[in-house]
């Protein structure tokens, strides 16, 4: 059994990058596994729902959804906590985290798909995850 946590995610997922950033900040041993065509079967066996990020703990526990993942790990790794110790500050921190998760991503998704050049770029990047080489065959 590996001592590393496994993070199934993708660079295009802000929630995956959020979780990976947390692991890096806390210096928690982990492996970054890109969810793609090669890892999909393994992901399907683990996933409760078909979303990333998914974290597999060394104890084989599956965690999904960025905020609950981080909350769970804060209990196991309390050093250098990201949660302020003062209750009012902790509330404000949690408020901004929730706001960012639910609303700050809206403009990101808008600009990912609004303009033709961005649509083309994002489409190619998403397509390469599950059908490698597909963009080379299309006149995009």
Task: Please describe what each predicted stretch is.
Residues 1-137:
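GST-like domain detector, emphasizing the conserved glutathione-binding G-site
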Residues 140:
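Alpha-helix-centered segments that form part of catalytic cores
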């Amino acid at each position: 059994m590996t001592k590393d946590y496994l993070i199934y995610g993708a660079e295009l997922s802000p929630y995956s990058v959020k979780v990976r950033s947390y692991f890096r900040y806390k210096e928690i041993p982990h492996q970054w596994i890109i969810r793609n065509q090669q890892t999909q079967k393994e992901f399907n066996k683990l996933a409760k729902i078909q979303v990333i990020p998914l974290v597999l703990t060394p104890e084989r526990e599956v965690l999904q959804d960025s905020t609950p993942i981080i909350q769970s790990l804060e209990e196991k790794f309390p050093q250098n906590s990201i949660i302020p110790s003062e209750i009012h500050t902790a509330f404000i921190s949690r408020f901004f985290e929730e706001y960012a998760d639910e609303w700050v991503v809206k403009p990101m998704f808008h600009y990912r798909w609004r303009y033709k050049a961005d649509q083309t770029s994002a489409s190619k990047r998403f397509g390469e995850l599950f059908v490698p080489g597909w963009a080379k065959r299309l006149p995009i």
